[in-house]
Amino acid sequence: MGATAESAAEQSAGTAPAGRLGFRPGQAVQEFGYDDDVDEALRASVEALTGNELADEDAQDVVDAAIYWWREDDGDLVDALVDALTNLADGGVIWLLTPKSGRPGHVEPSEIEDAAPTAGLHATSTISACQDWTGTRLATPRGGRR
């Protein structure tokens, strides 16, 4: 059991960040806002847990979830969220990842709270996603967005 337990523990440690965000094996996840400041360990964790590479923002396939790296100067958040909804399956979620308070590009929570309903979403929770990024889970209201 020793080797199996170690392997499971190592695997769990590698996928723990993605697990905190609620990702599951087999899910397709689209990524938006990639730049050199993203958390590579979180990206790798999502890919390891889901068993799929992250689809880039130009992908056209339907996805179960999206992660969006968003910084203060990235533009109009409402437009960005609407774009992220394009390929999102019914019942899918968007994790909006923003720099933590005190870090360059920090986004005030009130900006997210204002933008989400305009885009047809609501924030359901906010967590520390990784060392430098806060994650806000955005979902469509029950009954869908259409």
Language-model segment annotations:
Residues M1-R146:
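S-adenosyl-L-methionine-dependent methyltransferase catalytic core, i.e., the SAM/SAH-binding region
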